[in-house]
Amino acid sequence: ISDGLFRKEVPAYDKEVIRELVCNSLVHRPYTVSGDIFINIYPKKIEVVNPGLLPLGVTPENILHKTVKRNEHFANLCYALRLMEREGSGYDKMYEIQLSNGKQVPSVTEGNDSVTATVERRIISKESIKVIQQALQVEELKQKQIICLGLIAQNETITASALIKKLNLRDRDALSPWLDKLVDDGLVEAVGQNRSKEYRVSADILKNSEYKGTTSLKRIENYRIRELIIEDLKIYKSA
């Protein structure tokens, strides 16, 4: 992706993400269940299909947080060989990479006797790539905060409840380590009050990242809306 001095190479599929998915399928599959692992390559996505079901207590919704050990020694070996992230952090890493590349996070679906993990090829937000790069130039962010910023950047505005749902968190307190530093550091703005409060990337970050995405009245400050109305009335006096 090139825009003036800004340039970032975005692969169709990040090798770390694919490697993590394949290693996960090998390490976390139930070997008491027969069947092969399938890697299905389509023009717009890659699927890794695993025989068996997710470990007890793990669901497609809580897979970002919930860890249940299965084939522990195999997992430790793959981690020691640097083939995969330590147990419990693989999906965090994949979320970070996908969002930093302006793509959707991996999706997981559970069938009757198999689990399918899917990564999409399509970039859904080029602008969010620049937003995250600009934010990392001005602040040191943890993985959780990069993930949260990526989700916010891919949306014009988003509520805390929507973030909680996307991240499968318990409540607003659980969201704090993901979100609060972004607001405190001025990377994200909070608009509204209480339950109607929404979050968006700050105007300074958008400006410095040379944001060229679509903008609606939600993103324009009140004083700018007033100026636009006055200017419009000057042009169209008869109105």
Per-region residue spans from a language model:
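C-terminal regulatory or interaction extensions
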Residues: 1-239
